[in-house]
């Protein structure tokens, strides 16, 4: 294997993890033998005979190396439109139809700032699922349809030595302009490297962090994306008890039972269909999920 040194300007994954989960991720990396140097930046990459030999840091010290991997994040290239007044905070501003300040010019993907569902304002959420959906919406509107984009949420998924980490929406309220308006709930199981955090505002989920145990991560993402009021179960979500099961069951049943559901405009098929709520299948799913969850935590 390789001897790895990681240079970070402040802390590990600071843009998506809060302080506690960042420290846990750092600990997992260090257990793998990775040396982490924090609060330092690169001044120069030195070479000998055309090959990398060392990295000089901003304090003048050097880190000998034979390979450099650069992963400094995403910076939208806005030069094409920077003189048009169409720049938002970090990217090209678009409306709900993916139009820029010029109605016949559309933009989508990592270069744009779109409506962020959890933040309730424009934000640059640069990831593949968002870019893919935005591209489809932009294409439909360019072709003459009038299809609004519902908005995006930030989401990052990684794994460190088999320990999964998922970050959704707002994960560090203190970094937000209105940080005091948020409420958080946290669950920790230290011996299993488990850390879970939910972020609320006005009884709606705005973000979540899952480390080591994904639990109902998919359901949580859906609650954030749809901005479902969760006040009645807010204090019990992380316990994953019957109150959460019942809430999710009722939500699913209300959405599906007896309704004719239209495929989204971006789907190839546009044929509506009826879909009923299967009580037996849902009960079996709940039972299987609880059994699997209990086995995982006993290990």
Predicted segment positions?
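C-terminal catalytic lobe of FAD-dependent flavoproteins
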Residues: 53, 61-87, 163-250, 261, ...
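Mid-to-C-terminal Rossmann-like scaffold of FAD/NAD(P)H-dependent oxidoreductases
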Residues: 111-217, 266-298
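A short, glycine/Asx- and small/polar-enriched loop/turn
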Residues: 47-53, 101-102, 160-161
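Active-site glycine-centered loops adjacent to acidic/histidine catalytic or metal-binding residues
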Residues: 98, 110
């Amino acid at each position: 294997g390789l001897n790895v040194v990681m240079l970070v300007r402040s802390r590990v994954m600071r843009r998506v993890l809060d302080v506690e989960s960042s420290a846990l991720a750092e600990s997992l990396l260090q257990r793998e033998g990775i040396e982490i140097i924090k609060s330092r930046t690169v001044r120069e990459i030195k070479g000998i005979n055309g090959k990398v030999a060392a990295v000089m840091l901003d304090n003048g010290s050097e880190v000998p190396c034979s390979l450099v991997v650069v992963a400094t994040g995403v910076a939208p290239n806005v030069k094409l439109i920077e003189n048009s007044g169409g720049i938002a905070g970090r990217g090209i501003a678009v409306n709900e139809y993916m139009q820029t300040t010029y109605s016949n010019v559309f933009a989508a993907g990592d270069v744009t700032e779109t409506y962020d569902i959890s933040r309730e304002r424009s934000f640059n959420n640069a990831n593949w699922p968002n870019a893919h959906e935005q591209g489809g919406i932009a294409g439909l509107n360019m072709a003459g349809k009038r299809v609004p984009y519902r908005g995006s949420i930030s989401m990052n998924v990684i794994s460190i030595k088999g320990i999964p980490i998922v970050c959704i929406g707002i994960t560090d309220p203190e970094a937000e302009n209105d940080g005091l308006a948020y409420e958080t709930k946290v669950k920790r199981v230290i011996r299993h490297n488990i850390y879970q955090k939910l972020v609320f505002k006005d009884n709606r989920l705005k973000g979540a962090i899952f480390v080591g145990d994904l639990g109902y991560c998919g359901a949580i993402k859906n609650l954030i994306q749809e901005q479902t009021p969760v006040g009645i179960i807010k204090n019990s979500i992380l316990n994953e008890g019957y109150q959460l099961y019942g809430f999710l069951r009722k939500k699913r049943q209300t959405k599906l039972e007896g309704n004719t559901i239209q495929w989204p405009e971006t789907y190839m098929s546009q044929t509506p269909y009826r879909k009923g709520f299967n009580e037996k299948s849902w009960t079996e799913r709940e039972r299987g999920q609880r059994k699997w969850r209990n086995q995982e935590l006993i290990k």
